[in-house]
C-alpha cells in the first residue's frame, strides 16, 4: 500500500505540477548569515543531482560563505545566494524576492547557442505559409502529403483530447508523423500523459522515479515505476512510425516526453541531446521571506539511464549549415526518410 501511495504522489506531481510551480515550507530565522546557511543546508539535504552533475556542495560553501559581510544589503545578499544556486546548473532552480528572480542563465544560453533548428526554414519550406494552427500545434503535410509534420514549441498550455483527435483524423492517410519539439522549453508535465494517450498503451513502464527523502547525499526513496495508461484516446492506437525531433532547447516536460518514448516501438528520437531537466522542483521560504526552489526528484529511464543532463536521441542529426542556407532542414529530411522507409 505504501508503494502505491508514493507512486500516486509522484504521478500526481507530474500531473498537476508545471515546470514553474513551487511548494512552500515555513521560515525559522532572520539575519543574512542565517538566511545563507539555511539555503545552503536545504540544498545540501534535498537536492537530487549532486552526483550526476559532479558538484562538490561543500566546496561551494567554502567559496561563497566568506563573501558574506556584516551589514550586507538585500540586493547584495540576493546576488550572493543566487550565484551559489547557479553553480547547480539547473534550470529548475530559482531564488525569488520582491525585487528580483534569479535564473540559471548558463542553462538558457546553452539552449539558445546549441539550438538545432532554423525556424525560418521550418516556416517557409516545411510548414509553408498555408499551415494550420490547432491547440498550440502548427502543422501541415510534407513529402507530397505522405508525412504529417506537427510543430509544438511549448508545453505551457494544456493539450486536450479534441485537439489530438482532430490531428490524428486530419493526417490519418499519412504514412507517419514528425513531432517537432525542438526548442520546446517545457511547461505542463501533465501534457506528457495526454500526448502519450494516442499510442498503444497497455500499462507498460514509462520510467522510474525517486524522491530525495533524507539529509544524506544518498538518501532517496526506493525507485517507483510510473506506468502508461491501459487505454487509448483513439478507437485504434496510432502505430505508424513517429519521429520526435529534439535539441538542447527541449527541456523539462519535453525531456520527460522524450524519456517516455522508450516505451513505444514505433517512436524514435531524432536530432540532438535534449536539455535535460528531469527533476521535479520543490521549494520553501527563507528566514527573510524570500522563496526558493530546486529539483528534489530524479528520473531513471527504461534503459537505466539518468538523463538529467540531456536525453540522447536515437538518431543524432545536427543541422548542416550548407543545407540550411539552401532552405533544407536535414533533421526533418532524415526523419521523413526513416518514416517512408518503414512503409
Positions of PLM-derived features:
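Alpha-helix termination/capping residues and helix-transition junctions
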Residues: 13, 171-173, 236
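Bacterial Sec-dependent N-terminal signal peptides
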Residues: 1-28
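C-terminal "post-core" interaction segments
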Residues: 20-37, 75, 176, 185-343
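Flexible, low-complexity junctional segments that flank or bridge functional domains
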Residues: 19-212, 219-225, 241, 341
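Short beta-strand-initiation
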Residues: 4, 134-136, 279
